[in-house]
């Protein structure tokens, strides 16, 4: 199926200060966005795609100067794809605090002329949603046909349906959770500790020292990456295979160098991530994950938290996802059904763990395609 082709990001500037959940204020900030497809005359066919931890506004297509720069959800978004850009106008927004062009720790603080670094305020999922709403306003979009996301993106989609109930017709929440478990918070803490203890971190102001805390960021990514894969998937991909340049496949080196294929894979993923991602951004986004808990203001009652929602919902989970297990999605489904909301739920039998939401699985894509067909009929797309 064809890609959407060459795309280009655009930078949107916002002069009105944004008050954050922490009480801090971000003034004169920018957000980088990409759009795909055409907004119809009624402005009724817009879909917002929210990104997960290490992704960005670059949802689909490629950049003219880099043919390898395929968007992170290119198999999902494009002409004739499950989210069909021949029918829908799709927006991807790079969130505040990120390192891909939107205002974040790498940006210059207007008050000092130096990068914010550790001074950049902690942001939350709710802060991102408020910022995204301003993007919608700038496009003249009063109501999204759908807000969609996987993992952390799914949390944003759910938050949209809570915070702007009259602006979301459909919420598509994939491989997500209503809040992080203690185990998930613990994984994030270990990852952050790896970064914070890196000698090159310099209290978050490493830009001024001309270094990056790559060692810590590398370990953080390795920890995270393990949680994105299933045990079965790792067994099939790597098993206990040894990595040997000399062809001696059955002998140990009796050292702490790379011995197993899975070690080599994790080191490769860690090195690649540390080259392009920012450590301060990693700290911010993992903390935003930790803080997301819409039921907190309702004494932990998710049903009460979702009482004022108006959207229709598609909730999807994957059988081997142990980071955000299907049981967590079913918590959302139950709370919505308790509120007599219209909910479709699917647990997809897929071997790939949490990362399955990013992959091209026929059953998964057929589900999303069928749901968008329903939305298209509603909005005349």
Swiss-Prot record:
<dbReference type="GO" id="GO:0008899">
    <property type="term" value="F:homoserine O-succinyltransferase activity"/>
</dbReference>
<protein>
    <recommendedName>
        <fullName>Homoserine O-succinyltransferase</fullName>
        <ecNumber>2.3.1.46</ecNumber>
    </recommendedName>
</protein>
<feature type="binding site">
    <location>
        <position position="221"/>
    </location>
    <ligand>
        <name>substrate</name>
    </ligand>
</feature>
<dbReference type="InterPro" id="IPR008220">
    <property type="entry name" value="HAT_MetX-like"/>
</dbReference>
<keyword id="KW-0012">Acyltransferase</keyword>
<feature type="domain" description="AB hydrolase-1">
    <location>
        <begin position="45"/>
        <end position="360"/>
    </location>
</feature>
<feature type="binding site">
    <location>
        <position position="355"/>
    </location>
    <ligand>
        <name>substrate</name>
    </ligand>
</feature>
<comment type="subunit">
    <text>Homodimer.</text>
</comment>
<dbReference type="GO" id="GO:0009092">
    <property type="term" value="P:homoserine metabolic process"/>
</dbReference>
<feature type="active site">
    <location>
        <position position="321"/>
    </location>
</feature>
<keyword id="KW-0486">Methionine biosynthesis</keyword>
<feature type="site" description="Important for acyl-CoA specificity">
    <location>
        <position position="323"/>
    </location>
</feature>
<dbReference type="GO" id="GO:0005737">
    <property type="term" value="C:cytoplasm"/>
</dbReference>
<comment type="similarity">
    <text>Belongs to the AB hydrolase superfamily. MetX family.</text>
</comment>
<feature type="active site" description="Nucleophile">
    <location>
        <position position="151"/>
    </location>
</feature>
<dbReference type="InterPro" id="IPR000073">
    <property type="entry name" value="AB_hydrolase_1"/>
</dbReference>
<dbReference type="GO" id="GO:0004414">
    <property type="term" value="F:homoserine O-acetyltransferase activity"/>
</dbReference>
<keyword id="KW-0808">Transferase</keyword>
<keyword id="KW-0028">Amino-acid biosynthesis</keyword>
<comment type="pathway">
    <text>Amino-acid biosynthesis; L-methionine biosynthesis via de novo pathway; O-succinyl-L-homoserine from L-homoserine: step 1/1.</text>
</comment>
<dbReference type="Pfam" id="PF00561">
    <property type="entry name" value="Abhydrolase_1"/>
</dbReference>
<comment type="function">
    <text>Transfers a succinyl group from succinyl-CoA to L-homoserine, forming succinyl-L-homoserine.</text>
</comment>
<keyword id="KW-0963">Cytoplasm</keyword>
<feature type="active site">
    <location>
        <position position="354"/>
    </location>
</feature>
<dbReference type="InterPro" id="IPR029058">
    <property type="entry name" value="AB_hydrolase_fold"/>
</dbReference>
<dbReference type="GO" id="GO:0009086">
    <property type="term" value="P:methionine biosynthetic process"/>
</dbReference>
């Amino acid at each position: 199926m064809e890609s959407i082709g060459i795309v280009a990001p655009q930078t949107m500037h916002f002069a009105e200060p944004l008050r954050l959940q922490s009480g801090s204020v971000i003034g004169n900030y920018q957000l980088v966005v990409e759009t795909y497809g055409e907004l119809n005359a009624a402005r009724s066919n817009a879909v917002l795609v929210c990104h997960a931890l290490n992704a960005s506004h670059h949802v689909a297509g490629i950049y003219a100067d880099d043919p390898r720069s395929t968007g992170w959800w290119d198999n999902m978004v494009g002409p004739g794809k499950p989210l069909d850009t021949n029918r829908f106008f799709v927006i991807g927004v790079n969130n505040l605090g990120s390192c891909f062009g939107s205002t974040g720790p790498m940006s210059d603080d207007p008050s000092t002329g130096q990068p914010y670094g550790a001074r950049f305020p902690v942001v939350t999922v709710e802060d991102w949603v408020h910022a995204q709403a301003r993007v919608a306003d700038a496009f003249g979009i009063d109501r999204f046909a759908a807000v969609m996301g996987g993992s952390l993106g799914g949390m944003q989609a759910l938050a949209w349906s809570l915070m702007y109930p009259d602006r979301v017709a459909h919420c598509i929440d994939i491989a997500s959770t209503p809040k992080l478990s203690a185990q998930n918070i613990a994984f994030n803490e270990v990852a952050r500790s790896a970064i914070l203890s890196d000698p090159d971190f310099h209290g978050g102001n490493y830009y001024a020292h001309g270094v990056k805390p790559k060692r810590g960021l590398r370990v953080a990514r390795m920890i995270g990456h393990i949680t994105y894969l299933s045990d079965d998937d790792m067994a099939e991909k790597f098993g206990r295979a040894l990595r040997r340049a000399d062809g001696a496949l059955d002998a140990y080196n009796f050292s702490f160098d790379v011995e197993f294929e899975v070690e080599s894979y994790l080191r490769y993923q860690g090195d690649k991530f540390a080259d392009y991602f920012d450590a301060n951004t990693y700290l911010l986004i993992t903390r935003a994950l930790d803080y997301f808990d819409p039921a907190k203001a309702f004494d932990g009652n998710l049903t009460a938290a979702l009482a004022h929602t108006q959207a229709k919902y598609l909730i999807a989970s994957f059988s081997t996802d142990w980071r955000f297990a299907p049981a967590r999605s079913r918590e959302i489904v139950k709370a919505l059904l308790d509120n007599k909301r219209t909910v479709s739920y699917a647990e997809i039998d897929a071997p790939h763990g949490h990362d399955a939401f990013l992959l091209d699985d026929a059953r998964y894509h057929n589900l999303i395609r069928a749901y968008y067909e329903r939305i298209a009929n509603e909005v005349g797309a």
